[in-house]
């Protein structure tokens, strides 16, 4: 059975394909003529050179490629053939495993190298035999040995035989004659481990090592095959990859836990920063800086926990422009996360609650966007603060008589007070240009003869006085209009959709100033400059009574005027709806 890697049926299996492919020329086909010739030459040399004739038995085993010569003499000497010159390889094989190397004298190609192989044996007088041989084996031979070696004694012979016995295998004599083995070697029935040779593709510097000395052979009592040894790097690499993957998984889990902790900490910091932005109060220095000023009745303000440092307040809408407020503030590089309206106004409601330690506390300068301080939805009642919702709702009206007559409060007053007759008289007696003149409110004077507009005011009121003599019900027109306004006010109080939060109970004006009453943020009055005395703030703002007592010392008039105008503009913008803010910021309006 030819395995196509040397022509020997006992050749080892091919190594796995993961090894680097090395070009190896094929060895010549084995012949039996060289063996017979070498055996005859050896026998003739021994017979002619020995002083005392002794029968010599030569056993040649071609299948195992070894030459064992035993002499039946009284001195028990053993003749060993040692190569004179080592064979060098023309290439270098990569070292994959540590395997013992078979000496070149045991090569299967040493006996069948070529027809030009010459074996010379010379027998010395002392009984030592030395020889030289050359072969074309592709295996790296052992280190060169000196030519003149004495014949070893029985101890050396036993050591050499034990070393060579590792590579020998007992085979029947039929294999020595070139006959095929009894049981063919197939893929289904592989060759026994005892009949296998070492892999000639593997080279190693360790010459006298056995398989049991290999790290893999220590686990299976030296029964590890060459194929298993070649797979050791793969096993080690697989274990290394598993350890690396486990290490990466642990690192990923640690990173995920750290990210979750950082995310929770970031959310907590944002919540504390929003509260601090709403509630933080900054004292007014000697440069008379002011902003959105709301005098409060409490001395203490809500503080965030001591472990978390509050974020610095954000300057919105140009607050404190040119007054030195933004010199020590860090640059804002990230937009804050929007919060609910109740969270934004939570701290403001605590400040506006009645009660406290008196009205001598310093004014509270609120920093930030005015829209956050004046939200469109009231944090108390949850209703809208826009002008349309806060304006009183008109009395209901409807169309009756198949939608031909409008039933409303004004129409009822017109018919009840006979004002409809006066309107009809003015309409028929008026000129064309009188229909285009209005009373200043966009309503023509013909439709509203009782208006106070400047157009023909004397004539209209004179004719109404003359008609009241014939129509005395005209005298009830103004009382009925007053009753209608009272009904509208009552209806708007109970049916209004907007915020109707009233002002907080006021505190009297003191030496430090105070607030009389503060209504909803939609009805704030413009802020007047702060009063400054020698000890600091000497005046406050009272929305009901004006500026409280306290000397107004304008040491820096320009800064005060500029700050006051900036505060007024911010207050006006904070009171507007988003649509009106857009119109206010447009240069066309």
Curated annotation (Swiss-Prot):
Predominant location: membrane
Record keywords, A-Z: Cell membrane, Developmental protein, Membrane
Gene Ontology biological process terms, A to Z: animal organ development; branching involved in open tracheal system development; compound eye morphogenesis; dorsal/ventral axis specification, ovarian follicular epithelium; glial cell development; lamellocyte differentiation; muscle cell development; negative regulation of epidermal growth factor receptor signaling pathway
Top-rank lineage group of the source organism: Eukaryota
Expression induction or repression: By the BNL-FGF pathway in the tracheal system and by the egf receptor pathway in the wing imaginal disk and the follicle cells of the ovary.
Cellular component annotations (GO), alphabetically ordered: apical part of cell; cytoplasmic side of plasma membrane; cytosol; plasma membrane
PANTHER family according to UniProt: PROTEIN SPROUTY, SPROUTY
Record note on domains: The Cys-rich domain is responsible for the localization of the protein to the plasma membrane.
Job of this protein: Inhibitor of tracheal branching that restricts branch budding by antagonizing the BNL-FGF pathway (BNL: branchless, an fgf inducer of branching). Acts as an antagonist of EGFR-mediated signaling in the eye (where it is important for cell determination) midline glia, chordotonal organs, wing and ovarian follicle cells.
Protein name: Protein sprouty
The species this protein was found in: Drosophila melanogaster
């Amino acid at each position: 059975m030819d395995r196509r890697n040397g022509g020997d049926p006992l050749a080892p299996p091919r190594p796995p394909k993961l090894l680097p492919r090395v070009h190896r020329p094929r060895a010549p086909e084995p012949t039996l003529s060289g063996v017979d010739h070498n055996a005859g030459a050896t026998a003739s040399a021994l017979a002619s050179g020995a002083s005392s004739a002794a029968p010599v038995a030569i056993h040649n085993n071609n299948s195992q490629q070894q030459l064992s010569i035993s002499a039946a003499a009284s001195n028990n000497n053993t003749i060993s053939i040692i190569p004179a010159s080592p064979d060098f390889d023309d290439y270098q094989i990569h070292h994959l495993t540590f395997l013992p190397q078979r000496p070149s004298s045991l090569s299967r190609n040493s006996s069948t190298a070529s027809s030009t192989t010459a074996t010379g044996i010379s027998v010395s007088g002392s009984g030592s035999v030395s020889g030289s041989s050359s072969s074309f084996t592709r295996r790296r031979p052992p280190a060169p040995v000196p030519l003149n070696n004495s014949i070893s004694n029985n101890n050396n012979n036993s050591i050499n035989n034990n070393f060579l016995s590792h590579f020998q295998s007992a085979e029947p004599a039929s294999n020595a004659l070139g006959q095929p083995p009894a049981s063919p070697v197939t893929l289904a029935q592989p060759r026994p481990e005892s009949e296998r040779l070492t892999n000639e593709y593997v080279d190693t510097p360790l010459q006298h090592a056995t398989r049991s000395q290999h790290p893999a052979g220590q686990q299976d009592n030296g029964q590890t095959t060459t194929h298993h040894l070649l797979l050791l790097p793969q096993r080690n690499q697989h274990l290394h990859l598993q350890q690396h993957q486990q290490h990466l998984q642990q690192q990923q889990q640690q990173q995920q836990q750290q990210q979750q902790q950082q995310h929770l900490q970031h959310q907590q910091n944002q919540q504390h920063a929003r509260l601090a932005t709403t509630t933080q109060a900054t004292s007014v220095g000697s440069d008379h800086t002011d902003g959105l000023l709301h005098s409060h009745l409490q001395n203490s303000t809500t503080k965030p926990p001591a472990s978390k440092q509050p974020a610095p307040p954000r300057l919105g809408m140009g607050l404190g422009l040119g007054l030195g407020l933004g010199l020590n503030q860090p640059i804002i590089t990230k937009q804050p996360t929007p919060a609910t309206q109740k969270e934004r106004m939570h701290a403001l409601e605590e400040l506006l609650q009645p009660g406290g330690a008196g009205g001598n506390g310093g004014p509270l300068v609120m920093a930030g966007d005015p829209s956050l301080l004046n939200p469109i939805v009231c944090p108390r009642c949850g209703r809208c603060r826009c002008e349309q919702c806060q304006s009183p709702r008109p009395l209901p009206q409807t169309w009756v008589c198949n939608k031909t007559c409008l039933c409303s409060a004004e129409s009822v007053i017109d018919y009840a007070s006979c004002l409809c007759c006066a309107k009809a008289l003015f309409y028929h007696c008026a000129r064309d240009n009188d229909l285009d003149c209005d009373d200043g409110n966009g309503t023509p004077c013909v439709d509203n003869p009782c208006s106070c507009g400047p157009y023909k005011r004397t004539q209209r009121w004179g004719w109404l006085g003359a008609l009241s003599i014939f129509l005395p019900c005209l005298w009830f027109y103004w009382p009925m209009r007053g009753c209608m306004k009272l009904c509208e006010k009552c209806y708007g109080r109970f049916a209004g959709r907007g915020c109707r939060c009233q002002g907080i109970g006021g505190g009297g004006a003191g030496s430090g100033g105070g607030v009389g009453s503060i209504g909803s943020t939609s009805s704030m009055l413009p802020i007047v400059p702060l009063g400054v005395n020698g000890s600091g703030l000497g005046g406050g703002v009272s929305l009901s009574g004006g500026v409280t007592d306290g000397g107004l010392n304008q040491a820096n008039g320009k800064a005060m005027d500029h700050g006051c105008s900036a505060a007024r503009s911010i207050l006006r913008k904070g009171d507007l709806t988003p649509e009106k803010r857009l119109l206010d910021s447009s240069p066309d309006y």
